[in-house]
Amino acid sequence: MTTELLAPAGGQEALVAAVQSGADAVYMGFGAFNARRSARNFSDEEFRAAVSYCHLRGVKVYLTLNTLVTDRELPALAAEARTASECGVDAILVQDWGVLATLQKIIPDVPLHASTQMSLHTLSGVQEAARLGMTRAVLARELSRGEIAEICQKSPIEIETFVHGALCMCYSGQCEMSAVIGRRSGTRGACAQPCRLPYGFSGRADGHPLSLKDANLAPFVPEMMDLGVACLKIEGRMKRPEYVAAVTEIYARLLREHRTPTKDEQKKLALAFSRDGFTEGYYRGVRGREMFGTRPENARWPEDWFSEIRARYEKENLRLVPLALNCTIRAGQPMALTAEDLDGHTVTVTGAVPEAARSRAVTAEEVETRLRKTGGTAFSAAQCAVALDGGLAVSAGALNALRREALAQMEAQRTAVPKRRVFDFVPPTIVKNDAGKPLLTVSLHRAEQLSEELIALAPARVYVPVELLAQLDLSPHLGRTEFFAVLPRIYRTQDEPILRALLEDAAKKGVTGVSIGNLGHLPLARGLDCKLHGGWPLNLYNSAALAFWKEQGLSSACVSFELRDAQIRDLSKCLPCEAIVYGRLPLMVTENCLNANESGCRYFTERPASVLCDGACASAPELTDRRGEHFPVLRAWGCRSEIENGKILYLADKSKDWQTLGLRFAQLRFTTESASECVRVLRAYQGKTVEAPENITRGLFYRGAE
């Protein structure tokens, strides 16, 4: 298997830079629906020309439609996808479940890739993506070589991994920091990169504990090829074209020669861009402080070197398509020229019948010289054979015309758009909103939050992390409420037997439902006699996504908390829907344990990731930003960290606004609250008190996310 090198194309110049520097494929966006809306991107006409430019040179084009979209946006996205199909795009990257379902209906012949924004990080998640018809999965950047190897070995579809470029602190597709703090949604391509700002602990914002160095896995290219990784991806649609050229050229050589980089190549990668050096941490299975770094404000681009790079790729003659030319010139027959490329395309063109020479006859060498003049085209004459009868006269113009026609037909063949089925977009069926008031549900984070006083208030559901259920005695509460086991949104393939056992034990204790937050959770819950609920980590943004997950077996679902009130109201709710109306909104889930990085922790480095530590970090200081806002850091499965918003979403005094949106459930999300605080909040939402906590926010309920 040949490993593909995939390079970023944030604009036309970056596209040329990537192609001329050796990329096998490029990924790009056009229109409004891609994960880098701030990049230059492409208009419809530019995209069509870009696809032809790439296909002529044997380079594939992948369109990024990997953002979440609203119901009102879905028709426009469908139109963009149809245009892309008509242009001959090779594949489309998707994140949104509604987009996935829509594209499979309107352009069923276009391959779809699961974007890293889908948060796929386990073998089961990849296998589910294959079951759903996707042909490639882009894995989370946080996976180690061993985890990647296992997935590659057993995956029924192609695996793509990031090999170079920026690392997000949060798992892709799960970051809400930019949206909640500044309305700029990272899951909608508008991330403001708040992770690069100063933060700290103990009330001081004196460091950059969320700013990871760029990844550089160049030393592991041969190993990744041998693991069976189908595609190595370079990050950088927001970076300069010269950067794209420099990095692509080096990785292309490493792949071509199946080797590790030289010291000089590593220096060039660092010169192109770095943040206090690079990191290999996640790939090597290492987490810790050494992975973090910043780029000095006074850092400058290497303009002299970049000028040299730019001068090379602007000539556009570094990436030529080699052709084998075979010319036959026989007396009494039309001249014929056959051109064949390495991809199996063959064209044959004919010209005039040559005349007998009146003076000097043309030679085979002269014919070959004329045919090899491919300058100004994307072709080179790698081989040229001439079969020539003696005593014939052929003009230079006739040979030039023969060559030009052959190259034009070859270009037409290489850029031909495949015939594909295209269907009209049909909006999801409208389902009338539920007229009743939503039932209140509660989500717990700690065992002590479950109390008799809380259950006495009769919440409709209680969501509990599956790992906490073993600590709880549910028997006094059974029959008074429903308990749902919440699976961790981030885990590992090797954790699945543990999680399955926990679910089976939970069912024996009276738990009647499972809340899933990742595609890989579906196999874990299959076969259990329980309800399936779609949790907020699924990022359910539109009616098509709700319909998709209903088909996967969900009986209810929580919609994205990025949606504003009107957007929630307008959803066609084909299954009972829930929205979060209270609590600290989750901002990030991170592979690095922030408390361990700050204070040190032997558990972080000395025990299996699937075993919870003793919880000493639960009382660690909160994260503090430049404005003095404090963000609680909670412990998540596998000693990961979950950063919560400093402000608490509070809508008890706005009950008429969320009770009239057609919701079946309204969730109170408890994280740092004590047992008594949980009771007080539930009473407030039941209208029994008017007590509100300090430092509240309305979240995105009235304003939505960009």
Predicted segments with their positions:
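Surface-exposed amphipathic alpha-helical tracts and adjacent flexible/coil segments at the periphery
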Residues: 1-21, 25-35, 48-85, 94, ...
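Short glycine-enriched, charge-decorated loop/helix-capping segments at active-site entrances
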Residues: 35-41
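Conserved nucleotide-cofactor-binding alpha/beta core module
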Residues: 123-124
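Glycine-rich, highly charged phosphate/nucleotide-binding loops
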Residues: 42-47
